[in-house]
Amino acid sequence: MSVTQQTLEQLAAALRGAEANGTAIEPLRGAIGEDNGTAAYAIQRLNVAHAVAAGRRVVGRKIGLTNPKVQRQLGVDQPDFGTLFADMSHGDNEVLSIKRVLQPKIEAEIALILERDLPRADTTFAELAEATGWVLPALEIVGSRVRDWNIRFVDTVADNASSGCFVLGGPVRRLAGVDLRRAAMRMTRNGEEVSSGSGAECLGHPLNAAVWLARTMAGLGEPLKAGDLILTGALGPMVGVAAGDRFEAEIEGIGQVGVEFGAA
């Protein structure tokens, strides 16, 4: 399905408007086609460029749709990526407004910080591991500018992979000696378990997800760099969020992270 530049720009503006106004819009797939990933990423790039021009600072990338349970929840069958900005980052145990993210949901993830550039489109698992400086637990608060989370692959891609904000926990660890694949995750809401999983549910290994991202970004001419933060994807099902909720996640061998949601 051919999509004009004018249409791409109109859809990008509609997503920005939804974010600014707090009012979700209809799915984009009707305008660009259900399988038009090229157009979806073009919309995402337009909004990233708009954000950078407005002074927002890129600090890394997120990988979405890596967990089979999340894929089933959203009716998709492949990963995607989005851009992380500095103003999306929050500290461990912060209290966030429930209106911080539109239609918020939460998931626990393993975050990586690179200490070397990854310029090659054929980056290997070993090269990715060598380039990873630090590992830490994270909570990603995802959101959707699309009404009722009625999304397919192209909808979430265009919407910056349904990015909202994220919380980084601790301690910060070196990768050596940490078994990311076997790392078990348990997330609670107000003390009751609501999500669980392990690193193996993230494309078989969180570093597999990071390799996919490194290859993809290098192929696009935007390779990952030293200092970049990578959110590697959900370790278990995402969970809805309401005002007053407190979430805590523990990832075995890595650490803990928490966040609380207050009123508007």
Curated annotation (Swiss-Prot):
InterPro entries, per database record: Fumarylacetoacetase-like_C, Fumarylacetoacetase_C_sf, Hydratase-Decarb/MhpD_sf, Keto_pentenoate-hydratase
Source organism, top-level taxon: Bacteria
Lyase listed as a keyword: yes
Cofactor: a divalent metal cation
UniProt entry keywords in alphabetical sequence: Aromatic hydrocarbons catabolism, Lyase
Catalytic activity, EC: 4.2.1.80
GO molecular function ontology, one term from the record: 2-oxopent-4-enoate hydratase activity
Recorded metabolic or biological pathway in which this protein acts: Aromatic compound metabolism; 3-phenylpropanoate degradation
Alphabetized Pfam families for the sequence: FAA_hydrolase
Reactions mediated catalytically: (S)-4-hydroxy-2-oxopentanoate = (2Z)-2-hydroxypenta-2,4-dienoate + H2O
A biological process term (GO) from this entry: 3-phenylpropionate catabolic process
Any one cellular-component term (Gene Ontology): cytoplasm
Keyword Lyase: yes
Cross-referenced PANTHER family: 2-KETO-4-PENTENOATE HYDRATASE, ACID HYDRATASE
Role according to the record: Catalyzes the conversion of 2-hydroxypentadienoic acid (enolic form of 2-oxopent-4-enoate) to 4-hydroxy-2-ketopentanoic acid.
Cross-referenced NCBIfam families: PRK11342.1
Family: Belongs to the hydratase/decarboxylase family. MhpD subfamily.
Record protein name field: 2-keto-4-pentenoate hydratase
Taxonomic classification: Bacteria, Pseudomonadati, Pseudomonadota, Gammaproteobacteria, Pseudomonadales
